[in-house]
Amino acid sequence: MQELQYDVVLLQKIVYRNRNQHRLSVWWRHVRMLLRRLKQSLDGNEKAKIAILEQLPKSYFYFTNLIAHGQYPALGLVLLGILARVWFVMGGIEYEAKIQSEIVFSQKEQKKLELQSQDDIDTGTVVARDELLATEPISLSINPASTSYEKLTVSSPNSFLKNQDESLFLSSSPITVSQGTKRKSKNSNSTVKKKKKRARKGRDEIDDIFG
């Protein structure tokens, strides 16, 4: 880390010279942040090293804009040179490779979890149309109210309903009307006889003489 001592001194001079001119700019914040964390890493702070490696890609974006826009190209080139040196000394290449491997590993794990979740879902079994047509007809037994057990062979729902309606229609007992009419006729005959008897009782001897 002592290799970056010269870069720290250079950054201190840049900050001291331009702090009043660029203090409100966004890219200037990255310059001050880089200087502060470099000092912390030289003192042996490992967290500052990780923070610098995370900061460098964003700082690179802002420092390249200084060159692209033509505002401060010379200052932008100096800052990019410092970034490149810090990135190389602190192991930025290994850090980036580690991040990429972690991303790839997390993507693989996510795919495994998705496949496992799909396997746990019960989607049923696929039945082909030929298998349905090749199944044997179903035999059902129906017990009508007035007949004995009768077996019907069903090949389709429509034929089953048609056969059921026909069996129920044929098995139903005919309606007898004669019993009711006989009872009514007997009742009417008995009432007529009673009326005749009552009429005979009401006749006296004179009626019998004159007929």
From Swiss-Prot:
GO-annotated biological processes: endonucleolytic cleavage in ITS1 to separate SSU-rRNA from 5.8S rRNA and LSU-rRNA from tricistronic rRNA transcript (SSU-rRNA, 5.8S rRNA, LSU-rRNA); maturation of 5.8S rRNA from tricistronic rRNA transcript (SSU-rRNA, 5.8S rRNA, LSU-rRNA); nuclear-transcribed mRNA catabolic process, RNase MRP-dependent; tRNA processing
Entry superkingdom: Eukaryota
Family matches, as InterPro entries: RMP1, RMP1_RBD
Entry keywords, A to Z: Membrane, Nucleus, Phosphoprotein, rRNA processing, Transmembrane, Transmembrane helix
GO CC list: membrane; nucleolus; nucleus; ribonuclease MRP complex
Record-level Gene Ontology MF annotations: rRNA primary transcript binding
Region spans: Disordered: 178-211
Subcellular location: Membrane; Nucleus, Nucleolus
Modified residues (Phosphoserine): 156
Residues spanning the membrane: 73-93
Presence of the UniProt keyword Cell membrane in the record: no
Feature: compositional bias, Basic residues: 181-201
Bilayer topology term: Single-pass membrane protein
Subunit-structure text: Component of RNase MRP complex which consists of an RNA moiety and at least 10 protein subunits.
The protein's role, per its UniProt record: Functions as part of ribonuclease MRP (RNase MRP), which is involved in rRNA processing in mitochondria.
Protein name: Ribonuclease MRP protein subunit rmp1
